[in-house]
Amino acid sequence: MDRVNHVSNLYFIPEQAALAKWLVKNSCGDKAFFCNSGAEANEAAIKLSRKYAKTKLNIDYPVILTALESFHGRTVTTITATGQPKYQKDFGPLTPGFEYFEYNNIVSLQAAVEKIKAAKDQGHGLAAILIEPLQGEGGVKAGEVEFFKYVRQICDETGALWVSDEVQTGMGRTGKMWGYQNLEGIEPDAFTSAKVHSNL
């Protein structure tokens, strides 16, 4: 071996820079942030959403909405984001600031948004909707276009971010490069991806 291919992200890594350019060219994103796993990518997206809500939307208590039967990782915060009690059992207290709705159910999402609005006087506000474009753990449920149009509408109206969790759906696993590309041109504000990049 003549050179080290990867070291800490503290240092410039030419291959990582090339991957960042490729990701931007082949997605709706205009920047890339690298970390070490899918759970860490979702943790970073949660941190990004909270910081954005506090600094740009002036929300004191940011709330992130996620779907029931979702899967977002195995850290304490990402199991909280994961809408499945079986992954949360015995790991409490869980990270505050999450509420849940039924996947592909506009009425359920509306109710979750209204619950956050009702707590506005306590400083609560919608920071993000973190959602998979296709649920894997939830029984392989494809996202419905009309539902995701509503997700986009809610985020546009409130200023919240739509974060697409592409850890299980990205890099061609749904027939398109990214899962959100199956939604007839509706695009998220940010998306996460992970292990599939080792296939490049």
Spans of model-derived segments:
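Conserved N-terminal phosphate-binding loop of PLP-dependent enzymes in the Aspartate aminotransferase
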Residues: 1-200
